[in-house]
Amino acid sequence: MAAPSEVAAIAPGEGDGGGGGFGSWLDGRLEALGVDRAVYGAYILGILQEEEEEEKLDALQGILSAFLEEDSLLNICKEIVERWSETQNVVTKVKKEDEVQAIATLIEKQAQIVVKPRMVSEEEKQRKAALLAQYADVTDEEDEADEKDDSGATTMNIGSDKLLFRNTNVEDVLNARKLERDSLRDESQRKKEQDKLQRERDKLAKQERKEKEKKRTQRGERKR
């Protein structure tokens, strides 16, 4: 379990799809390794978000192999994956709490809204009773029966309207959250594809540098 200081360091933030603390940590780690964080930071985040657990290490090694020695490559990739997992534990907990609070607030507002028809209904019944008493058009028994029927119908209508209103609005909230997640995932995928092309170019450039260095070494040996 992460210590309190570690939890604070990986608390969720906006704009990097996982957590502000993790994004900052990853940028610093890549910079220390001599990796272009502007290009590879978002690409690594996309892999951590989209790939299955067992595929993350392989994907990270494929990216960072162009920059790291083989003896340190695996340990650094494991470090990144473990840090990401710690971040997600915190982010998941916060998101669940936020969703519960949002739904609770929504239901509370709905309850306040559906109280108004009940108050209007009581006022109408009082006016009706006063009118009936004034003109004595019905007997006391009929008046009581009418009151009972009106009350039952009003309660049933309010209950149905309340349930429909609650279900509709909760569904709207959940649908909006899903659309937002889908949009972020699509954007991440586009960024992932662009960064993959950049990674291939970097690997090719590195290979060319190695070939040139090898040729220079061979020429030097022939001269000796």
UniProtKB/Swiss-Prot annotation:
Stated name of the protein: Coiled-coil domain-containing protein 43
Compositionally biased spans, kind Basic residues: 212-224
Compositionally biased region (Acidic residues): 138-149
Organism encoding this protein: Homo sapiens (Human)
Crosslink position(s): Glycyl lysine isopeptide (Lys-Gly) (interchain with G-Cter in SUMO1): K95
Keywords, ordered alphabetically: Coiled coil, Isopeptide bond, Phosphoprotein, Ubl conjugation
Extent of Basic and acidic residues compositional bias: 176-211
One term under GO cellular component: cytosol
Cysteines paired by S-S bonds: none
Residues modified as Phosphothreonine: T139
Region (Disordered): 138-157, 176-224
Record carries keyword Coiled coil: yes
Coiled coil (residue ranges): 121-145, 177-218
